[in-house]
């Protein structure tokens, strides 16, 4: 299965890394992105002016509960402002999105610690390095910054979502849908479920997160699943969870089973996935 957003997201993440030590210029560019499409910059600080920002919060600007039309408009403006060569996507299958009311990865100025945003940049940089070359040194560097960020204000499962956005073939997203899907023996091997279930009851530390992602990839490589990588898994988890939610609606309405047209729709989507 092809995910056209991956090339754009990966290239944009690499572009953002060059602004790690030049955030004033980055903030100017973000303001320009919104000005070009006549949209208001979302509230990212206690006042109206952006003081500082991290790369995952920037990704969150177009990965939250907004319309696809607005998402495409923002991404298109980003492409022009940052010189992104990858095609601007118009399909976003397999992408987890943030709650609009919890869309920053940091607390506002009076609530966050001095190094909070710097720490997020550091785990962002370490994640890209680890995705580029998976070795012990890069794992240690990633783990150091991940564990620092893990305990910061406003960091929840969104940390795993951010890692997935920037390098989706290297990092697993552990949003609620994926956690639900991964811990069901109908979807993953029983030994995998037993090994990871207790590790994802709450946001895992770096060692547990790396264990979950590595164990998942091993299971996908060794099993005969329709999903062979994290993006396919994420998409499939979304698709099946939507099916289950719809079944619950029908049951509450007094139906014994889904209407035939819905069965056919699910069957078609399963074969596509």
Where are these regions (language model features)?
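An N-terminal alpha-helical hairpin/helix-loop-helix interaction module that forms a charged
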Residues: 1-152, 168-248, 252-254, 258, ...
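Short hydrophobic alpha-helical segments that form membrane-spanning helices or hydrophobic packing faces
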Residues: 159-166
